């Protein structure tokens, strides 16, 4: 679980996302409150429930990007889902409870990786011994059943010395490219079972049964020592783990630190002109209520209580408004954050400030072909103006418009990059006007091309 302070979280988000300070502060405080709650005594900790967040803002302003970056910072079970994928229980489509099941799967994988890191040193030693046993097979047992090398003999000393020499070479990487034949555990069978809605539990049990068949079998494989070492370390680490301990820790992690990011929640708002049951809109909202309020979900790893899972919902709300959500769900999302539409100045910052900005990416990509691309301040300003103008005159898709404009701008040089190896290309305002200026002015063309 992340122990970063709200200020540190916001600073980290600022490296990748421009503006939207209110949203950053809200998620930073929510994430820090997870840590604060864990410092309380058990009795009070159970009473402190998370304050769920609803982020409102037009498309392309950073809602989903905040979720992506938050997932990396949280160091806790995190899942991002699209609200539009779900339907009411009993109808064709994914059930809402599958969110918690998927979150638990994420937690189990995360917990297993963390536990494997703790036993990695022992696993590396065991992997080393197995490789050395292949390179220098131990002495065979005699007819009496005792190893012939039990007694201290000069030959045994020589063998131990040789083993240490090979161990040193192995650790220094001198044997990486040598091929050996070694017994490795066979990979689990990948079985996909299709089942009707509502029978997911039976499906997962059948899949586990088929996957466990033959899981103890080994197969001799010939490969380089470098590749074999990686697989052996993972295999030995898995042997050192107790599956029950992994499940127990994962369930605790989900219940206490789990975060669900529910995107496109505005798409499940009920529209006024519809009549009859709305299984993919209001029905989904009703099914979502118990999860957000707190319920118990049965998963293949065990029972999961959702009382302390944090839900962050987001939506553009262009065709609807937050008040179109059913009142009970509105009450479960007490913190409202409105994200602002991006301006031309924001576009300039997006193109220059993030550590992996679009201009940096294009520079690095074309540099692999020997073409050095540089963007002038006037060129970047003009790209931002074109993107902003097209957003204003057609559909406003926010910062995603920069991808479209830049791809169109760089199309020619990207195609002919191999012919211009060793050359330098300066993207200034004139270059931008020449390649996308006219398109941005023609509304009909920009609607289809930009």
Swiss-Prot record:
GO CC entries: HslUV protease complex
**Predominant localisation class:** cytoplasm
CDD domains for this protein: RecA-like_HslU
Give the molecular function GO annotations.
ATP binding; ATP hydrolysis activity; peptidase activity; proteasome-activating activity
Per the record, the similarity remark reads:
Belongs to the ClpX chaperone family. HslU subfamily.
The protein's assembly and partners: A double ring-shaped homohexamer of HslV is capped on each side by a ring-shaped HslU homohexamer. The assembly of the HslU/HslV complex is dependent on binding of ATP.
Which protein is depicted? ATP-dependent protease ATPase subunit HslU
Q: Which source organism does the UniProt entry give?
A: Idiomarina loihiensis (strain ATCC BAA-735 / DSM 15497 / L2-TR)
Q: Which gene encodes it?
A: hslU
């Amino acid at each position: 679980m992340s122990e970063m302070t709200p200020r540190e979280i916001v600073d980290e988000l600022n490296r990748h996302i421009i503006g939207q300070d209110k949203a950053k502060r809200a998620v930073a405080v929510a994430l820090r409150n997870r840590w604060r709650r864990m410092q309380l005594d058990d009795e009070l900790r159970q009473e402190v429930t998370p304050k769920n967040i609803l982020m409102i803002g037009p498309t392309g302003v950073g809602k989903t990007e905040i979720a992506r970056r938050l997932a990396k910072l949280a160091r806790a079970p995190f899942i991002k889902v699209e609200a539009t994928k779900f339907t009411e229980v009993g109808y064709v489509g994914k059930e809402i409870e599958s969110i918690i099941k998927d979150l638990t799967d994420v937690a189990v994988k995360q917990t297993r990786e963390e536990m494997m890191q703790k036993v990695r040193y022992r696993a590396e030693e065991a992997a080393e011994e197995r490789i050395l046993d292949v390179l220098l097979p131990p002495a065979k047992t005699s007819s009496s059943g005792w190893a012939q090398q039990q007694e201290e003999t000069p030959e045994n000393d020589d063998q131990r010395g040789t083993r240490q020499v090979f161990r040193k070479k192995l650790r220094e990487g001198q044997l990486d490219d040598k091929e050996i034949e070694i017994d490795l555990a066979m990979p689990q069978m990948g079985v996909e079972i299709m089942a009707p809605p509502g029978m997911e539990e039976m499906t997962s049990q059948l899949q586990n049964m088929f996957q466990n068949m033959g899981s103890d079998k080994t197969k001799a494989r010939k490969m380089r020592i470098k590749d074999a070492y990686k697989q052996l370390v993972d295999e030995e680490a898995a042997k050192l783990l107790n599956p029950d301990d992994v499940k127990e820790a994962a369930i605790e992690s989900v219940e206490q630190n789990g975060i669900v990011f529910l995107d496109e929640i505005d798409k499940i708002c009920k529209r006024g002109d519809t009549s009859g049951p709305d299984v993919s809109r209001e029905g989904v909202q009703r099914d979502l209520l118990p999860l957000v309020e707190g319920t118990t979900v049965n998963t293949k790893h065990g029972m999961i209580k959702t009382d302390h899972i944090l839900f962050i919902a987001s939506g553009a709300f262009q065709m609807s408004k937050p008040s179109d959500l059913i009142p009970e769900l509105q009450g479960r999302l007490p913190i409202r954050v409105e994200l602002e539409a991006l301006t031309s100045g924001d576009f300039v910052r997006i193109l220059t400030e993030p550590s992996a900005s679009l201009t940096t990416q294009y520079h690095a990509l074309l540099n692999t072909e020997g073409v050095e691309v540089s963007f002038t301040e006037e060129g970047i300003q003009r790209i931002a103006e074109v993107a902003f103008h097209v957003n204003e005159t057609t559909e406003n898709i926010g910062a995603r418009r920069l991808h479209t404009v830049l791809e169109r701008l760089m199309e020619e040089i990207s195609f002919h990059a191999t012919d211009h190896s060793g050359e330098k290309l300066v993207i200034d305002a004139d270059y931008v006007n020449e390649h996308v200026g006219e398109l941005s002015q023609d509304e009909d063309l920009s609607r289809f091309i930009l």
